[in-house]
Structures are given as structure tokens and as C-alpha cells.
Amino acid sequence: MLSVENGLDPRAAIQVIKKKLVGSVKALQKQHVSLDTVVTSEDGDANTMCSALEAVFIHGLHAKYIRAEAGGKRKKHTHQKPLPQPVFWPLLKAVTHKHIISDLEHLVFINTDVGRCRAWLRLALNDGLMECYLKLLLQEPARLCEYYQPTALLRDAEEAEFLLSFLQGLTSLSFELSYKSAILNEWTLTPLSLSGLCPLSELDPLTVSGAELQRKESLDSISHSSGSEDIEVQHSGHKIRRDRKLTASSLSLDTASSSQLSCSLNSDSCLLQENGPKSPDHSEEPMSYDSDLGTANADDSDRSLQEVLSEFSKAQVNSAPSSGPSQESDTPMFQTPLSLHSLANSTHLLFEGSEEPFPAHTSSGTSSGHKHQPQESPDMQPLGTAQAGPAGSTSDQQPSSPVAGAADQGSEPWKALEYGRVGPKLVVSSPTSPKGKSWISEDDFCRPPKEHALKNTSDLCISPLQGTPELRTALHGPFSQGPRKSCSLGALDKACVSSLDYRNAQTAPSPAVTQDHKNFCVVHRRQMGLSNPFRGLMKLGTVARRGAMGIWKEFFCELSPLELRLYLSDEERTCVESCSLLRCEAVGPAHSDGRFELVFSGKKLALRASSQDEAEDWLDRVREALQKVRPQQEEEWVNIQYPDQAEDSPEAPPDNLPPYSALLPEHAGAQGIQPNWTSAQVPEPDAIKESLLYLYADRTWIPYIFSLSLESLKCFRVRNNEKMLSDSHGVETIRDILPDTSLGGPAFFKIITAKAVLKLQAKNTEEAAHWRDLVRKVLASYLESVQEAVTLAGSLDENCQEVLKFATRENGFLLQYLVAIPTEKGLDSQGCFCAGCSRQIGFSFVRPKLCAFSGLYYCDFCHQDDASVIPARIIHNWDLTKRPVCRQALKFLAQIRAQPLINLQLVNASLYEHVERMHLIGRSREQLKLLGDYLGLCRSGALKELSKRLSHRNYLLESPHKFSVADLQQIAEGVYEGFLKALIEFASQHVYHCDLCTQRGFICQICHHQDIIFPFEFDTTVRCAECRTVFHQSCQAVVRKGCPRCARRRKYQEQNTVS
């Protein structure tokens, strides 16, 4: 297998893929769910997630589906091995609709099967169908065997189940990923390394050798404009390789803002343009080195940053057009403003002005030797213009530029770099410095908005650094820590300021640095003077949780800024519960005994700490996490004042936001008609909330009156001043309700049901928030009533509840009818709609059919007269008749058929007394349980044989009162008694003939006969209820003096008391 040949075990590759996938999805949820923003290809975490998903499909692929690279940029470097190109497009076509296949195969810039595979994955994420596609693939094991080896991730049942459950977290995200880019035509290094086809060492950013540098020039770092342009750079420094070729991709750093670099290089004619068509979506594919796989030390960072500025300054001088002095003075080289926001994520540049002129260094790298004319007035120089000085000229003709600084993050030390005696002072905060004394993380800083940052730097006068003898060509970004914490080269290429005084940089801090230090404000978190040993964890410890039956059980609890996790113990890292803080609705008070409650959407956690103080500390940390994970109100933030932009600025900042009306999508703002929110209709009698909302349907917004009750959400159309029922959604079909600002603003939200997603618009933000709050409360009330209907009846224990939640995700509302006879409410209560598909039934429509299991009405498609016994009618009425049920109920009964969900002793114990057959069955079940105790202690292996005969119903040996739907069906058919008798006969014969089991029998202490008797012999023996000793039934009836053993024990106790 290729992964083994490359030194990576297939199982280890799976863990690497899972770690990458989990980390990227959690980062996306943290960044986008609370703000309801759309995930695009500009997000580094989104590209990391795509790479991990691509690695899922590549892992374990058969060798015949992996071919060598047919072309690409790695072919330019003959000393490198070509990247393998795995192809699984025929497998994807088997589960994809023909229209989608046709669209992907007719994309203009996607012309390879590799490109179609990668485009298919991104399109599936955009459509929210990734989980659905994966389910379809896993249902076809024959195809998976054809394409994948036995050790592949997709052929591992447990790993595939984990992947399915984890992909459900993507439902809270909206994707708009680019899938039409020509970059997708070839595999990048990241998914191949994660899947094991390439060594993981190729992703290591610490290597600074030339070969490793060229390996970084993969498609991971190519954008729209920098895909194929090369810059011929010839340096005179003795440490420069003269045959070195600088490409735009090699000049890039790990950044999610690659389009800034490509646009700045392309628009200013710094690169040679390539002929031929360009992909319109290239700019949407960010550049990534995946540098989170390693961390560089400070020295490597210093060297790499120095090389970045030096090498790029050379590229500016040598690649400038040489058409004459007039062209040099009229054509600005760089006009994109400096973005401090991108710089502040990973590096901090400090430019310090000079009062003393010094001679500028000349560059020998110019190709034509033209001398540039100095500007007559430095004030007339356009903002952001890069200008090269003449050979031998002095820099006193240009004044020093204002200082632009960036604030230190946290309390990490500053490190200064310098270029000989001249050049900018580059300051880098070490990303892994252990000297920080604060618990405050990067997310606790409130950075200024981008437009303010641009205003603060609009007065910079930029000019390139001219050659220095210490330049080298190595170019890396080892100081970057992931795609989001990256340094934009679009800012670094303009960070070359002339007339800098190195001595002033060491003596006096710049005023801009002081100002930027004041601009950063800490909004929350504790400062304890010590470094946080558990980075990312806010609190951990042991708490007790109250179960369904009121029993407290201890768990090891971890609180992170995003979720609360419960483990079995601190050693056994088995997660039994994970609650997202995004769904936390209320935090209860701490009681004197340490009890406190956390209320989430659909469930409530009852927890208990060791003391009240400990409980209050838990609540404080939860509130702190909630404040951090949820967006705060605008009035709570500190207003940061910035100097106004100069009036003579040649251009306005490019990041000025358009008016709010321009941000509205076409379907929300292009109507041209103002919504009418007036409604004079009488509310429904059972309505909790009823108001006018606009529903998005058929590419337009239509007004409807929505009425919410404890049982359903009804939708009415107003015609002739009368309400006409248009649709009805049962509360049991509602999955979630979420804000959706992407539709046009905070007044928009969506309701996710089992049948459709309702996109709605309320009158204002408060009205939308009120609707979301009420729907969540109604849904929580319904789920609580369903749980009480079964749990309080004693039919479910905690283990069965977990199994049931997994098995009945879609039909969980039918659980309430398992032990309770349904009440028929009539067709009018359903609004004349089918309870399964919302099709209109009754009257002149389809004839309604009653489901005997749920008491609801269905159409002829959802109800096809399938017959089944009704468990609730057997339990309460001993009604063994088969009745017609809907297909939904039949599927539900099949899903839970083998689960022991009914405890007859708690639901209806009188059934044993009133029904003779149930009395005999209960007697046989007790015998079987006692025999199971004997076989469980025997070492002969008889228990395994008995388990085979049980047909996986091991609960028969655990409790005599637990029954499943399969047991009730066999009781109705009359075969259950024979099944139990066969089991009792087998087990009793073993006990009678086993030497070990017979030694655990009893001798009657009344007659002292040598015959061994057993407690499961109900016909001839009787057992003392107190000491559990077994006697002959005839001997006990004759003596009538009670249990001799109990009498002796009481006598001994009296003697001990007297003595």
C-alpha cells in the first residue's frame, strides 16, 4: 500500500485526517455559526476542511486508480518526483444526479477527472448534500470494495459512522465555495499527504533548503494572477543563486488574502502576464502552506522575514518596465493600500522615521541601467507609489514617512530585525512563546475595523528597498500558524520605506506604536499572572449528572469556549455528552448542595458540583464562554478614534462598505415593493404566537400569517379578507430554527423541518428574535413531554435512551405512542393535511386513513394498510389484534423491534394477575433469569451457547420484566412460551449435570435431605424472602415456623447484644 511505502501506517493516516477535519470544522463553526455568515473559499479553514474531505476519498484507493502526474508545475523541476493523481470520478457518478454530472462535465475550466472530483466535493458542500452522498456510498459496499482496499477509511464501519455523525455539524454552516477554478484540475500536496500518498514531511514548513522551497511551489499557493507568471531576478549579492527564478507563488506567504497579492502584482505590471484564457474563480482559491503542522523558532522567523522583504524589493526593481524616465514617474507601481488588519494576525511591522539623510544603496540588478529622475515635490507623490532612486543619489529629497505600527498581541516578547544599517525594522511576536503571563487569547482583543486601519495608514510613502549585500533567496512563512493567522504579502510588498533612521528606531518608540497599543482593548478573561497550562480549556473537573431515573452519576467535565463535554472519567476519554454553547439558552442558579442547571435547545442538564462555591465557579466560566462565543452589542464595545483621512488623498479606501440596501440579495431587495405588515385577522384559539411573516418561495417573498401552537405551526393565506390554511407543520417535524442574515439582515430567519426549510422575514429584529425564542420553547416543551411520557412510565433506562436517539432520529415523535394508547383528535386538528407528507386529504381530496399506532391521519401513499399489533394496546387492554398502521409507524416499530424499551412491572404490573398467559410468561422469565445467574458463574462456556439461542436478546437474562416489540409480537402469535421453555430446558440440564453448578445448590435445612435443590425449581421449592435460603415446599408447609436460618441469625444477634 502506498501509505505504508511512504512511512505512514493506514490507521495513522486515518487519525491525521480526523484530526485535520475536526479542527477545521470546529474553527468554521466558531467563526461563522454565531454570526450566520457564509463560508467561502477565501477562508483558510474551509480549504483545510476540503483537503481533509478529499483525503477521506483518496485514503486506501486501489493502485489502479492512482496514476502519475501528466503535467503541471512540478514538471518544471525535473529533480522532483511527480505527484500521484488518484481518480474516483466514476465512483462519484454512481451516487450523483445526472444533471449535476452534466454540469460538472461541461465546466469550461475543469477538464480533468481530478478536477471534477474536487469540484464535486465543493459543490456538494454548497448544496448541503455531503452527508447524503456519503450515506449512499456506504450503502453500496460492492462499489467500495472495487475502489478501496480493506484498510481504507470508507470501508471501516466505525470510522465511516464517525464521519457521518461528524458531518452533521456542517448543517449549521452555509457554503459558497468556488468549484469552477482551473486550479482544481490537479491535486495539491495537502490531501495527498494527509491520505498517505505523499510523506507528511513535505508539509513541514521548517525546511529551508532549495528543494523543499520548490516543493512549496505547488498548487496550494497559486491564485488567479500568480498562477504562471515568472520573474527573472538577477542579484549581485554573493549569497544569491544567479539562476534562481522567483515566481509569484514562491513570493507568497501563507495567507487567506491571496487575491490582494495577485491583484497588486498583476495590476501594476510587476509580473509578465501569461497569454490565454484565465479562470474567473482563481482568486477564490487561497494560498496555503498548511504550516500548522510545524512551528518555527524565532531565528528562522527572523531570517525568513528578512529574506521576504529583501527578495521582493529586488523583484520590484528588476521587473519594472524600462521605457524611460517619464514612464517611471507617471506609472505607479503599487497602489493597493497597506492592510494592517492582515498584518496584525501574524507579524508586526514597525517603520520608524529618520531626521538625518543617508545615501541610498544602488542596485545592480537592473537590466537596462536607466536612471530615475527624483520628484520635485515629495508632497505631490501619489500615495502608495513605489519609486526607485538613481544611482548615487541621496534620499534627502524624500521626507520620512509617518510611522505605522502594530500592537503586540498578548504579552509575547517583541523581536527586532534589521537590514544592515538601513531598512525597515520588522517586529515579530513569537507564536509559541512560553513567557506569556496572561490567560487572554488572541480572540479577546478587539481589533479596529479594516476601514479605520486603512485610514490610519493612508499617509505612508512607499519606496522599494535597494540592494543590500546580505540578501538571500530562501523564502518561507514558518511563523504562520494556520491559514487564518497569516501575513499578507499584499501588505509586505509595500512595507519598504525610504529615509529610515536605525538609531532612532533603537532609542525612541514611535507615536503610532503607542497609539496602536491604545487601540487594542481587552474585553474579558482573567489575568492570574501565570500561563494557562490548558490552552483552549476554561475549566475541567468532576461533576455529577442526574439521570432519567433521578440517579446521580459522576462524570469528568471539560468546558471549552465552544462546548461542554462529559467523559466517563479523566482516564477513560470516552465522550458521553457534548453540548454546544451556541445552543445554550439559560444558566440556572447554584444551590447550597452544589446543584445547578444548564438549559440547551431541546434538553436540560442537571449537574451537581462538590460545593456551592464550585458550582458558582462553573456557572461563571459558562457565562464567560457565552459572552465570548456570542456577538456582543455594539454599545458594549470601546469606540476607537482614528485620525481622519487626508483631504488630498488620491483615492478612497477600497474597503468602504456599500449602503445596507446594496448588501441585500436580489430576492430580498429587488422587489421594489415595500412590505405591508398590517393584519386584522382574528388569531387562532390555540395560538401562542400569530403574526404576518414573508415566506421566500419561487424566487419571491409572499406574505403569510403564521400561527404557532403547542402542537403545530400553521401557515395561512389571506383571500377575500379570510384566512385559508395553506400548510401545517407538526411540532414533531421541526428540527431547528436559526437566524439567517445572509438573506438580507437580522430580521430574517429560517425554520428547518423534516420536509423543507422555511426562509422567513419578520417585521424587525425584535420580532424575529421573539419568533425564534417561542419556537425553541415550544420544541423544548414537546421533547420534554415525549421523554416524560416514556421515561416516567419506566419503559426506558438511560442506556436505551441513547440507543433510541441514534436509531430514531427521524421518527422520534412516535416514541410517545409506544406505551400510551393514542387519542384520535380528528382530521380538523391536522388542518386536512397528511401527517407524513403534508398532502391535502379529506373532502374532495384523497381519502384519509387512520394510523392505529399514532392516531393521526395519512394519505394513501403514506398509509398502505400495513398491519401490526399495537404494543400499547397489548400492555393496557391485552388486545392482540393486528391493526392498520402507516408506513412511518411500521418503520419505527422495525427500528426498535429488538430494544427492551418496555418495563411491564412499571407500566402495568396488574397484567400478570389478570391474564393467565402473562402470569406463566412472567414465571418462565424469572426462572430464566435465575438460570442465567448460574450459567454466568460457570466456566464451561455454556453461557455463550445460551446467548446464541437467545437470538441477541440478552436482556432476558438481566430482568424478568423488560419486553421488546419483538416479544409482544411473539406473545400475540403464541410462540413466545415455547421459546422460553426451550431456553429453560437447555439451561437447567446444564446445571443438573455440571459439577461446578451443582456445588452452588442448596440443602434443605428443615429435612436435611442430601438431595440438592435449586431456586429455579418453582414447583418443588420455596425461597426465604429475607435470607434467600431455599427449602422444600412441603417441608416449609409442615413446619410453619418460619426460616430456621433467620431464627439462628436473630439468636446470635441477641447473644451479642447481651454480652
Curated annotation (Swiss-Prot):
Is the keyword Magnesium in the record?
no
Q: Which organism is it from?
A: Rattus norvegicus (Rat)
Which sequence ranges does the entry mark as zinc finger (Phorbol-ester/DAG-type)? 989-1043
Query: How is expression of this protein distributed across tissues?
Result: Expressed in testis, skeletal muscle, lung, liver, spleen, brain, heart, kidney and bone. Weakly expressed in monocytes (at protein level).
What residue spans carry the Polar residues bias annotation?
313-334, 392-401
Q: What does this protein do?
A: Acts as a multivalent adapter protein that regulates Rab7-dependent and HOPS complex-dependent fusion events in the endolysosomal system and couples autophagic and the endocytic trafficking pathways. Acts as a dual effector of RAB7A and ARL8B that simultaneously binds these GTPases, bringing about clustering and fusion of late endosomes and lysosomes. Required for late stages of endolysosomal maturation, facilitating both endocytosis-mediated degradation of growth factor receptors and autophagosome clearance.
**GO-annotated molecular function:** zinc ion binding
Q: Which domain of life is it from?
A: Eukaryota
Query: What's the protein name?
Result: Pleckstrin homology domain-containing family M member 1
